[in-house]
Amino acid sequence: MRKRTLIVLGILLASFVIQSCSSSPERGIISRYFNAVRMNDNATMASMALEPAQWDVASWDIVSVSPEKIEPMTLPGLTKAEADAKKAQDGQIGPTMDADTVLQNAKDEQDLARSAGAKAVAKKKVDEAQAKYDTEYAKMKEFKTNYTNAKAAASAEEQIALFSLGLRELASIRDLSGNVHSKDVVVNIKTTQGQVKSYRLPMRMYELKNDAGQKLPARWIIVKFEPVV
């Protein structure tokens, strides 16, 4: 087990060194990945792809490589969007509960109404309170959905960044600055059964700096394998 761990760590270290010296790392990375697939080396596959996949591969080839993009790290912005969405959701709790209280009180009054006139007035109050509650509840659902989506987006980006850095966790990851390199690679995979399958491989590398301004070791990684229809 210790030997297997040392081998995986060696592969990770080698990938850092090789990728830093190569402007077109995708062929080497993908070649090493498919070698691991053929050897059924799950540990190596899991060290190279955030969402690894496996087939009975006879051969493979690269169909296309998109131009490399270099963009600022988005995680700080996604973290702020998550915080803003949570604030909006939490701020809507009070108005929704207040509207519900008014609605329940109106329904109680309606239950106690006896005369036709009192019932008509009570029904109008219930209808108005129901409309108000429906409006506030719809806002609550929207804010909750927005927060759920924002939280998921920030978490997903955090996991990709950590994976590129070769780390399981880093307390300050959401506060780091730097650039994200990305490209899409399309590959054709021929299985041992003769089937040819096409996949798009989003690839990323995060070049980030810590609080002291020092660059953190970065490597290209495969995010996932997306079937090309």
Predicted stretch roles:
Residues 1-4, 10:
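Positively charged n-region of N-terminal signal peptides that target proteins for export
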Residues 53-71:
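Short, charge-rich amphipathic alpha-helical segments embedded
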Residues 19-20:
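C-terminal motif of bacterial Sec signal peptides marking the signal peptidase cleavage site
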Residues 9-16:
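Bacterial N-terminal signal peptides
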Residues 73-90:
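Alpha-helical linker/edge segments of TPR/alpha-solenoid repeat scaffolds
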Residues 41-56:
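Short, well-ordered alpha-helical segments enriched in acidic and aromatic residues
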Residues 89-229:
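Exposed beta-sheet edge and beta->alpha loop/turn motif
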Residues 25-40:
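Short, aromatic-enriched amphipathic alpha-helices that serve as compact interaction elements
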